[in-house]
Amino acid sequence: MGHTITEKIIADHAGKKEVFPGELVTAKIDLAMANDVTAPLSIKTLEKYGIEKVFDKDKIALVLSHFVPAKDIKSAEQAKIVRDFAKKHNIKWFFGEGEGIEHTLLPENGIVVPGDLVVGADSHTCTYGGIGAFSTGVGSTDLAYAMATGEIWLKVPESMKFIFYGKLNKWVSGKDLILYTIGQIGVDGALYRAMEFDGEAIRSLDVSQRLTIANMAIEAGGKSGIISPDEKTIEYVEKRAKKPYKIYQSDKDAHYVEVYEWDASSIEPMVAWPYLPSNVHPVSESTHITIDQAFIGSCTNGRIEDLRIAASILKGKKVHPYTRCVVIPASKNVYLQALHEGLVDIFIEAGCAVSTSTCGPCLGGHMGILAKGERCISTSNRNFPGRMGHPQSEAYLANPAVVAASAVLGRIAHPEEVASEVLV
């Protein structure tokens, strides 16, 4: 019997010829990552046990992303803990205020490459599967262990396969495919499983949209999300890679506990209603819902490709007078590129508030928090009660085109209702 891409990556990092689902292994990691929310606990854990050295300063990434620039004294102190630790240990991949969100920065800068095994103290670490890495979120104490030893103990996950055949409709993106998937299987439909995506529609997506799909695997309970590399992946990685990489592919006779096949041409832009990412409805069934805020950004959809799509909708238009729109590029490089292309001009002229790179309102951090009773349509990845502010606020999830169109009309809208000439 053959093996999946996930099993092959884990086997190589565990020093084994092969591994099987359910097997417990200790695997070498290529990168350990934490942010300003999760790293302080990892650092305190290392200090508690008297661990003076990290296993490899070049294989640790620390990113100040969630509450930056610091919104209060507590968040400033959290950032200082991380900054001081990075300086003390000469951590190679330390990113300070304004550099961006970790899940955008690491692929963008070639720090994560295909075939890597990455653990991060953030649930959306699964993002890197979009370029063919096995990456998964862990707790801060597990992350401390990884930082000290360069290893992680884990159970080999079962794999599920999701095949999207056919061609995508206009305005349908990777965000819609993953929302559709979660809507079909539920928030626990892939519990501790590797979610592997393939098919004609998946292969038509650029790397940015593949990262979006992998990013939201955790919203179905997945241990990871992964798309095997192809020519598009290699083209993306070759421009960025800071180290050698290895391409893995699933065997044709690999075993999957479940296989789903869907016709992508039957899918329209999707919207996840409160209060679960699985509460998915077509945008055509959502246009009666008024909104107070639109948010374009996050590690899910804050890359340059996302901003281009949003700008193509907003060009020459104005945000609805009773709606606010917050745009946050997911990294400094994305911000600079958006400036160079004139996208920031479009956003500001439309009436958007454009912020330095940060997670912002996605997690209810700052720069766009919702009041009681307010509704936001967002390009981010979660819509639990209180996720973006007050427990009695509401968050709706959608792709950048839908969010931008909604900002113009003050209600959830199909992009065709307000579309300008597409910039991409």
UniProtKB/Swiss-Prot annotation:
Description of how the protein assembles with itself and partners: Heterodimer of LeuC and LeuD.
CDD domains in the record: IPMI
Family: Belongs to the aconitase/IPM isomerase family. LeuC type 2 subfamily.
Function in brief: Catalyzes the isomerization between 2-isopropylmalate and 3-isopropylmalate, via the formation of 2-isopropylmaleate.
Lineage, top ranks: Bacteria, Pseudomonadati, Aquificota, Aquificia, Aquificales
UniProt-listed NCBIfam families: hacA_fam, IPMI_arch, LEU2, PRK00402.1
Name of the protein described by the UniProt record: 3-isopropylmalate dehydratase large subunit
Example GO molecular function: 4 iron, 4 sulfur cluster binding
Pathway connected to this protein: Amino-acid biosynthesis; L-leucine biosynthesis; L-leucine from 3-methyl-2-oxobutanoate: step 2/4
HAMAP family: LeuC_type2
Keywords: 4Fe-4S, Amino-acid biosynthesis, Branched-chain amino acid biosynthesis, Iron, Iron-sulfur, Leucine biosynthesis, Lyase, Metal-binding
Pfam families found in the cross-reference section: Aconitase (PF00330)
Keyword Oxidoreductase recorded: no
Catalytic reaction(s) noted: (2R,3S)-3-isopropylmalate = (2S)-2-isopropylmalate
List of residues binding [4Fe-4S] cluster: 299, 359, 362
GO biological process, one term: L-leucine biosynthetic process
Leader sequence segment: none
PANTHER family: 3-ISOPROPYLMALATE DEHYDRATASE LARGE SUBUNIT 2, HOMOACONITASE, MITOCHONDRIAL-RELATED
Highest rank taxon of the organism: Bacteria
Enzyme class: lyase
PROSITE patterns, sorted: ACONITASE_1, ACONITASE_2
Cofactor, free-text remark: Binds 1 [4Fe-4S] cluster per subunit.
Known EC number: 4.2.1.33
Cofactor(s), names only, from the UniProt record: [4Fe-4S] cluster
Name of the gene encoding the protein in the UniProt record: leuC
